[in-house]
């Protein structure tokens, strides 16, 4: 069951409106491709969740605030009384994880995921919900290689989604 649909970000809508009207700089073109790929990855995840629609409640593209902190949640699924927070990445290429951090990236998606999980848990507790929250980075693009990945990392690859929610 879908409770909130996904919409294009304001940034993506702006890029699409300008595309063809102006020539993007290299940096603008890179950012446009990044934002577009992210949205496409989120839509692909939505399609996968829709195939499980009878067992899943979906909330997409949420902006949450609690205790002066905010987070953007790509997808929140409720399955059998458990809440799954998914941060969706449509990355392509090779990446390495060492000691819980992505090598060579300035921002750490695992830290972002933990922060989002804390905010979701706080909001649920504040409104009287006592449910377990499981947070996962979902790498939706099959053209990704993750080196150094351990079972302790809260990471799902595309082929693991269906069995994970089993």
Stretches with model-predicted labels:
Residues 1-71, 80-82, 102-166:
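Surface-exposed interaction regions that form or flank ligand-binding interfaces
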Residues 78-98:
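Active-site beta-strand-loop-beta-strand hairpin of nuclease catalytic cores
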């Amino acid at each position: 069951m879908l409770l909130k649909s996904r919409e294009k970000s304001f940034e993506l809508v702006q890029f699409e409106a300008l595309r063809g009207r102006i020539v993007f700089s290299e940096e603008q073109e890179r950012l446009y491709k990044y934002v577009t790929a992210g949205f496409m990855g989120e839509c692909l995840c939505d399609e996968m969740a829709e195939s499980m629609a009878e067992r899943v409640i979906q909330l997409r593209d949420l902006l949450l605030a609690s205790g002066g902190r905010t987070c953007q949640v790509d997808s929140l699924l409720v399955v059998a009384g458990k809440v799954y927070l998914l941060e969706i990445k449509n990355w392509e290429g090779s990446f390495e994880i060492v000691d819980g951090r992505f090598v060579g990236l300035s921002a750490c998606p695992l830290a972002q995921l933990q922060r989002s999980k804390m905010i979701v848990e706080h909001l649920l507790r504040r409104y009287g919900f006592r449910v377990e929250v499981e947070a996962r980075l979902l790498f939706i693009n099959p053209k990704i290689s993750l080196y150094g990945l351990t079972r302790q990392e809260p990471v799902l690859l595309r082929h693991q989604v269906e069995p994970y929610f089993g």
